[in-house]
């Protein structure tokens, strides 16, 4: 079923690429609701934007740890438009329905990679943003969720082509992407806290390395993980699945030696 976007909640860490979407949403008459730095960014572009604390009647608190975690926000996201009791409670509690959520999470992995202190790393564990992603994705029948800057260009094209309207298939697609983002984010946090104990294996990636082909040339292949972190390809074609098998054999071979060693496989 087609849905019209009338109100958007926007809370992003990085602002790059957002201006074009805001311009198109504003042209379509969409109302903006936002928090902190994102609110300042939106108003600096000359657009009217309602602050989240105007809706919640609570200020941002605990050093910004609590901003959007409130029934006035999540009620407006999770309310099922075709559910009689939900509609009744929306009216009873004056919940502002939210049709679009745009989130860009705190850069947890980048903070870890920068060598930051644990205090700084912990503060980059996003709570409100990840909750907004999950809430909006759960209610994809009524709500659009844009959960990554990587989705901005595609969503902007959609807005230009069909206005502030989305199909159920489009909303379901973005929900799928949202759960991919949230699972990758939580996997990164788990790996940090696992501290090398390897009590479990968690791997999630929204950008796997595309291989030249799978085990056979007619098959597709993907590598999930950070290949470039451990290996430098000096020359030749793109890596295939069989190349990875050779690399694994070479690594297993040289790991038997404590002195610097190299292996040649053909």
What would you call each of these model-derived segments?
Residues 4-7, 27-30, 45-48, 70-74, ...:
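Short coil/turn connectors at secondary-structure junctions
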Residues 11, 78, 101-106, 146-147, ...:
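Short beta-strand segments
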